[in-house]
């Protein structure tokens, strides 16, 4: 392949197409997105914090192979690496990048779903990192998984997941989404809800370890364990949300104006996130995630929802007011003016009203 540039990311070096020669990354013969470095770094930390060695790791949509190579070089837990791409040019580049990093891997030139079905019951980790939606590959990912393991998926079709394209959202994820101020969380839980339903169909129970939003994508990593009876537990965390005048109502059946089906259970595990923050970068971001995951209630709030006289409290003030009122509250990574609170909308609103009334009485 012509027009390659040598790049470095994390602890590896690799060749990727020179975007200047191809008019951008989306026109290059093999896709590599430097904006996903944080995604790859956090996922590498997660594998390391997961704490199990000798893992069989499969990345069926490998592109340049950088994600899988980073897993092998940096995590210290990969026993066998399986890389694949349907593009012959990508496969050639993957082999080149494996060689310069001294990494061994099985490399395939297959349709991703064909490979995943061939790998039935043989993988500890399956990481779906497509250009667009992971939905077409989730069934195959569970088929390739052993009795237990990790399922990771990236979705860049965020506009679909948040309901901007209702028909496509219904076709692709089987969900109906209504716009809300916390639409980012709805989109993330939409993706998780889809993965949970597919998991149940494949007789797996899932436990999210890390789920987050970052600008142009959603990312989910979940522990999965096989067992038909336990798989039913997924549906204990599937529901609908209805938003009316600030109130977030969780419903167990669809009704007019509701969004769903969505995952309403935990978004992640604060313990594993804290482990990640101890061994790698992005500590501030991981701290926010760990705090968010410590609150079981879904749906974040936004400061303008509680504005009085055209003014909103600062985020720091809002968190302080709620904690003083006995309502645990933390920042959310999903909006700069957003916070999670372990309380219903009415309780949060009343706490702010008392604070505003008290402030006025002191003037």
From Swiss-Prot:
Instruction: Name the cystine pairs.
Output: none
Q: What class of enzyme is it?
A: transferase
* EC number, as in UniProt: 2.1.1.216
Q: Where is the Trm1 methyltransferase domain?
A: 5-352
GO BP annotations listed: tRNA N2-guanine methylation
Task: Write out the catalysed reaction.
Answer: guanosine(26) in tRNA + 2 S-adenosyl-L-methionine = N(2)-dimethylguanosine(26) in tRNA + 2 S-adenosyl-L-homocysteine + 2 H(+)
Q: Which PANTHER family match?
A: N 2 ,N 2 -DIMETHYLGUANOSINE TRNA METHYLTRANSFERASE, TRNA (GUANINE(26)-N(2))-DIMETHYLTRANSFERASE
The protein in question is named tRNA (guanine(26)-N(2))-dimethyltransferase
**Organism name:** Pyrobaculum aerophilum (strain ATCC 51768 / DSM 7523 / JCM 9630 / CIP 104966 / NBRC 100827 / IM2)
Q: Which gene encodes it?
A: trm1
